[in-house]
Amino acid sequence: MPNVETNLTKPFPVVFSGHTLKYEIECICKIFLPIRKFTFLYDTAQLPEDAEEGAVLTLEQQGSQSRFFVRVQYLGKTLEQEQFFPACSPETDKQLCEYRFSAMLFRLLEQITDLHPAWGLLTGIRPVKKVQPYLGKGYTKAEVCEKLHEKFWISPEKLSLVYDTAIVQQPLLEKTPKRGISLYLSIPFCPTRCSYCSFVSHSIEQAHKLIPGYLEKLCEELVIWGQLVREQELLVDTVYFGGGTPTSLTAEQLEQVLTAVQDNFDLSHLREYCVEAGRPDTITPEKLKTLKRFGVDRISVNPQTMQDSVLETIGRKHTTAQTVEAFRMARAAGFDNINMDLIAGLPGDTPEGFHDTLEKILALDPDSITVHALTLKRAANLFAEGESQVHNPVEQMVQESMRRLPEHGYAPYYMYRQKNTIDNQENVGYARAGKESLYNILIMDESQSIFGAGCGASTKLVEPCGRITRIHNYKLSLIHI
């Protein structure tokens, strides 16, 4: 992908005339200008006089018609497009107006930059939801892909990926109990902070004094959730320990939290109990035995890469040898559902290095492999280095995983997209049949309530009508305590 960025520090102005349809327009701009900041102007129909680049989007009502006009100045080029449609209003026809502006802006930016995003116009984080309405209506794969391509201009490879993912999910979602809920526990501590990470987490070195008090409050929160689950006669379907790195706790501390879960919830209907062991250097036989004793049946051992030089660059204080040791330790402890996370596009990594990582992971034969595309979030140290990271060969790495993993019996079972993902790529979980993570599927499908406990956890309440209410806990451990 060519370098299309100019002055990265100067905001890119976007002018809205006759409407205020900002959200989707900004999303389209970010596809082509992923780390630029934007200035949004509403009280003018023109770019500022000193602007060397920017976009103008105008909506005018002309009798029985609406005039849509888009002009883009970028990379020394100026392109514009004008279209007329039957009269529509941004107040009463918001989605339609957004779609028309998005399509026009997308085509102009595509022509100027010579970039052809594989996901086309699709900006949402849950592509599988675009497929699901067709599955119950008897549409074939070819028919579904044709319809989505016509509307969103998605590439054949991505269409096949999202369709195959939806097909794997369908029977698992059909088995979800009507009164089922998932329980998420946040353990926001890590041995060290990775340079790419923007999650609210604290290194053990800095925050070890906070842990006892934090766990005490977490267990108190579990008592409250447990009471609510009993009163409402709900069924705990899945439990997921995330973070952070849950195994940065000691075995005794893990037992404290696991006991609180066991004492406050009926786990007899549980379909999945997952703990993100995460960092290989935090995994010990004692911790694995503790997890196994409390019924945990799925864990993650997350190397992110099997290149020692890259691990050092991103601030992960473990080696590939420790990853192999931790994985074998988990197998010896009796875990038969182990996931391994990889990240495509890490600083210092190359297509050759990623290929070598894939080969080493496949040799270990985990039960599932999740491939993330590096996301430049504003809270991460890497964001400041965004200019050099925006156009690295992430797409090539992701495509290799899409090809190699199915060859070894792994099928895509869940996926999601994020803003500021390098090369506009996606995160995909691949699994052997029967080893899919139910929690991962459910959180993306948004069809089941999730009760979040701990710092930074989010609760998602899904009503029978489909309406979703989100409740966010405090992000910082000190505030939570």
Predicted regions and their residues:
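Short, well-ordered secondary-structure micro-motifs within conserved domains or adaptor modules
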Residues: 36-80, 85-90
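Conserved non-cysteine loop/helix-boundary elements of the Radical SAM core domain that shape
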Residues: 201-401
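N-terminal [4Fe-4S]-dependent radical SAM core
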Residues: 113-116, 136-183, 232
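Flexible glycine/acidic-rich beta-alpha junction loops that bind and position SAM and/or redox cofactors
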Residues: 309, 313-314, 344-351, 366-391, ...
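Short Lys/Arg-enriched alpha/beta "domain-start" segment
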Residues: 10-50
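Canonical Radical SAM [4Fe-4S] cluster-binding loop centered on the CxxxCxxC motif
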Residues: 179-215
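Conserved small/polar residues in nucleotide/adenosyl-binding loops
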Residues: 479-481
